[in-house]
């Protein structure tokens, strides 16, 4: 609506006038809606958008009732060719930061596993979606690794670990499991010592 646009424009002007140092600022639009403004540097290095995505997730965590965020991708003044990659990196950083290992926690699971739906609004939505497939595959691998290293050793022993890794063959990954005899033949005695 015109009122909301007016409120946001006024907020942006005040941020500019104050020369706000913070990279993320929030504005209450109504009781149920907030507007977040993310300042992007003119010159940035690799992984900058990934870092900003993670920073944004940390920032919004303090707002307990947020369930969905509309991300206005076209508001960034970057070339049309760069936008899909930059926003994919932002979403990737946001999702990586959202990881939690709560399998053994007795707290309210619904509360600690609260997901925030990130909805991208852009004329390049399909390109962002296609670009993100690459980052999503990495994210899934990172989350699997984090899950495995977070398991206690009495749960994730060598046998159980091989069972988990074998599941990756469904994705087309070739997996070779080395038994004790093969490990000895290859001289992997340190590994055998750890797995006892």
Where are these regions (language model features)?
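Short amphipathic alpha-helical segment within the helicase RecA-like ATPase core
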Residues: 1-196
